[in-house]
Amino acid sequence: MQGQMHAVWRKTRNRPISGGGFHGILTLHIPAFPRILMDILKPPRKGANVMLKSIYLQQVYSDLTARDPEQKEFHQAVREVLESLNLMIDSHPEYREAALLERFVEPERVVAFRVPWMDDTGRIRVNRGYRVQFNSAIGPYKGGLRFHPSVNLSIIKFLGFEQTFKNSLTTLPMGGGKGGSDFDPKGKSDGEIMRFCQSFMSELYRHIGPDTDVPAGDIGVGGREIGFLFGQYKKIRNEWTGVLTGKGISYGGSLARTEATGFGLCYFAAAQLKDNGKSFEGKKVVISGSGNVAIYANQKATELGGKVIAMSDSNGYIVDENGIDYKVMKEIKEVKRARIKTYLDYVPSAKYVEGCKGIWTVPCDIAMPCATQNELDGESAKALIGHGCIGVFEGANMPCTPEAITVIKSAGLLFSPAKASNAGGVATSGLEMSQNSERLSWTFEEVDAKLKGIMEGIYAACAAAAEKYGMKGDIQAGANIAGFLKVADAMLWQGIC
């Protein structure tokens, strides 16, 4: 049927349309022509993913890649979601009629702007800033700001798209957004970073607000940067409001926010391990990265009985078979802002290896990629499997390549996607928004207990969605389906907007 329809389309596509019909093999009245058949007559462009079984999904993806062919990271994120929707999309014809997926993969708003600032030598420098407000169907846009030389529109769009699902899974009323700049804070003085942040906020303030868009931190944006950004917003608007999360405790931040993503990752992993008759107890854990997510994943994994034996930064990785002391890592990264090699000054028996990719060759039971996107490829996944790894739990945003995910799942390892297991940070940001709105401050224990409950709830929702649509145990598919359905329902209720 599909091939016949495409043949018809090829024979008629260059003929003129008049009188409301196609001239040639078919003469049909267009207003009465069902949209679903129009989609079938329109052949997928080259590049449509063969794993997308639905013609509708193929068309959505091929149109997307044709529109922005250079945005590879964004394409990867969208394709991964669409593949998970194969088995459920045909039971929802209302999505096609409302062009819901076409709207879902297109941001509501993209803001790009220049960011001029002065360095310590008096030289004027210019960077590019972004804010992608992806979807506000279930709440104000919510998502972090990333300052890193690799930042471009494709990366910010992929992060905003992923954020929409992640926020949906928390069950809190937050839409999806993301922003950032190609500014590199590494090697910059506090004064330079302050001037950059002030310039960045001098444009961003026009587009955000506590009921519109609430940014937070991400790679390159920690407590220092959030403080500078918040101060500039407050000065420009002459108001104190919860417009940013990840703030310092002294000016409206939430206890446990710093620890939230790493702790949440381990709470999710513990729930998935438990559901499969396993636990952290006695397991060797490898965690890539050494930022907030990695450091606090180390702490919680250790508290749950695991032993973290390897961590990394962009220069290399350390191996400590006795277990990496997370307190030492906090001292190195949060106080001294030094490279991970400095760990050897504290623990001479540890080993340091140049280059960060080799960390996945370290034998372990549990792997937690917490550094950056596409850091764990197919070759690395095979190395983990060869050493008896039982599970890969994503802590960074999209850290595993599609090939790696295929290898991991085909080998029967447990796998959790970042949009689910990485949601602890934004969940606690939502709790910070609630505290700011009510002018309250909860204890660390209260926030941590709420976080644990949210992460266990996310796992349960993902597992249930996967089972409902015939993919029991596939937490990646379950996360995509559960996150999508809530936002899709809200979009249908709100009409074409």
Please identify what each model-predicted range represents.
Residues 256-361:
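Glycine-rich phosphate/diphosphate-binding loop of Rossmann-like nucleotide-binding domains
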Residues 212-216, 239-244, 287, 310-313, ...:
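General beta-strand structural signal in soluble alpha/beta enzymes
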Residues 316-415, 420:
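Rossmann-like adenosine-cofactor binding region
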Residues 50-255, 486-495:
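N-terminal ligand-binding/catalytic initiation module
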Residues 52-77, 272, 385-497:
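Adenosine-phosphate binding glycine-rich loop
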Residues 27-50:
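Short, Lys/Arg-enriched N-terminal segments with co-localized hydrophobic residues
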